[in-house]
Regions:
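Short His-centered aromatic/hydrophobic patch
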Residues: 93-99, 118
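Short hydrophobic beta-strand element within catalytic cores of glycosyltransferases
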Residues: 44, 294-297, 304-307
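Short alpha-helical donor nucleotide-sugar binding micro-motif in glycosyltransferases
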Residues: 83, 256-257, 264-269
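A conserved mid-protein helix/loop that constitutes part of the nucleotide-sugar donor-binding site
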Residues: 20-31, 197-220, 224, 233-239
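Aromatic "clamp/platform" in nucleotide-sugar-dependent glycosyltransferases that forms part
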Residues: 277
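A short helix/loop element that forms part of the nucleotide-sugar donor recognition site in Leloir-type
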Residues: 179-192, 377-382
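Conserved acidic donor-binding segment of nucleotide-sugar-dependent glycosyltransferases
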Residues: 308-325, 333-338
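N-terminal strand-loop element at the rim of the active site
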Residues: 7, 12-74, 233
């Protein structure tokens, strides 16, 4: 705990319990804040899966997979009553429903600090979520509004000034634990080929993650296997595409991998490839950086921000989404050249030190500090700055 920050009672609020980067980031933040002496509970509005039931200090307000109209009314009443009873100093919320809906209820319940966190660009929200978030932020339900990257903050540029004045950036942070396995043992753990380069992608099998691009370029690569870790609605489509391209024998669909096993999976790989269409800030890329992998990524703004610009300044290859040839050339160079992979891995590992859980926690801790003036917000680039 910062020497000037009093011990706080905090509620971390998120829309639903399910596998996802936002959920992992919120739980990571909770553990870090708790280690600094704060009283922290994590509340899920509802439960799509029971994934985190065994975590400490968890509440589920409505144990259903998807609340209907009556369910949302129940959520409003339960959240209001539990906030009034718990009397937190601050609520930190992740994801649009927890932001707009949850922080409006928190304001009604008299919570003094209400920090919303935007995890993706505004244009990715559904229309009614956009309206809810815009209204809540404009009417003062957020005392601070955090984007996990500057590109996310920039996506709100057309919002009203009363909304924008609360925006700031706190990047994601990873509490990294290196694998204790050597690469051969790591490959054996997951049943992966013992020889040849492994190209790894971690993420939901969904349109956003764009794994089809990797399948399209795989036939042109002289060696290597593609490992897809994750599951989702696009799995069947991707399996059919692999068959159509004649690369089924070179693609491994691992399915969901437990979070605790991710360091071992990254140790097994040589190259991390992520042709994602959009991100807020990718935890998967941060983990690959901490693990020291050569990284090839789409050149979307969030990835450019994380990987350090473009050209010689970048710690990974940043490539356009509409140029399969560029992806083929980049991956082929890495497949053929272990020394190039090692150089890129070293640079990625060095830049990863900018994205630690301590830095992320510092940012949120300043925003919920009830001893600080409410008109000041935290930016990791500029320290504390007065809102305009």
């Amino acid at each position: 705990m910062n020497a000037t920050t009093p011990r706080l009672r905090l509620v971390l609020l998120i829309t639903h319990m399910d596998q996802g980067g936002a959920q992992e980031a919120l739980l990571r933040l909770g553990r870090s804040l708790r280690s600094r002496g704060h009283d922290v509970e994590t509340w899920f509005l509802y439960e799509k899966s029971p994934l985190y039931r065994n975590e400490d200090n968890i509440r589920v307000l409505l144990p259903v997979r998807s609340p209907g109209a009556v369910g949302y009314l129940q959520l409003m009443v339960r959240l209001f009553r539990q906030l009034r009873a718990h009397r937190p100093d601050a609520v930190i919320s992740f994801l649009p429903l927890a932001n707009g809906f949850g922080q409006a209820v928190a304001r009604l319940a008299g919570v003094p600090r209400r920090v919303a966190s935007q995890r993706n660009p505004s244009w990715t929200y559904t229309p009614w979520m956009q309206r809810l978030d815009r209204l809540a932020g404009t009417l003062g339900c957020y005392t601070a509004n955090v984007g996990n990257s500057q590109s996310v903050v920039d996506s709100f540029a057309a919002y009203p000034q009363p909304y924008r004045r609360h925006l700031t950036v706190v990047h994601n942070g990873i509490d990294w634990r290196s694998s204790e396995l050597d690469p051969a043992a790591a490959r054996a753990r997951f049943g992966l080929p013992a020889g040849g380069p492994l190209i790894l992608n971690i993420g939901r099998l969904a349109e956003q993650k764009n794994q089809s691009l990797l399948l399209r370029v795989l036939p042109s690569l002289s060696a290597g296997h593609l490992v897809l870790a994750g599951d989702g609605n696009d799995r069947g489509k991707l399996e059919r595409l692999a068959a159509d391209l004649g690369v089924t024998s070179r693609v491994i669909f691992l399915g969901e991998v437990a979070r605790a096993a991710i360091p071992d999976l990254l140790r097994a790989a040589d190259i991390f490839a992520m042709p994602t269409l959009f991100e807020g800030q990718s935890n998967a890329v941060l983990e690959a950086m901490h693990a020291g992998l050569a990284i090839v990524s789409s050149d979307i703004p969030a990835q450019v921000e994380t990987l350090g610009g473009s050209g010689e300044d970048a710690v990974g290859d940043l490539l356009p989404l509409d140029d399969d040839g560029a992806w083929t050339r980049s991956l082929e160079a890495l497949v053929r050249d272990p020394a190039l992979r090692a150089l890129m891995a070293e640079r990625a590992r060095a830049r990863a030190q900018l994205f630690t859980v301590d830095r992320m926690t510092d940012g949120f801790e300043r925003l919920v500090d009830i001893s600080a003036p409410e008109g000041r917000v935290f930016s990791p680039q500029a320290g504390l700055r007065q809102r305009s």
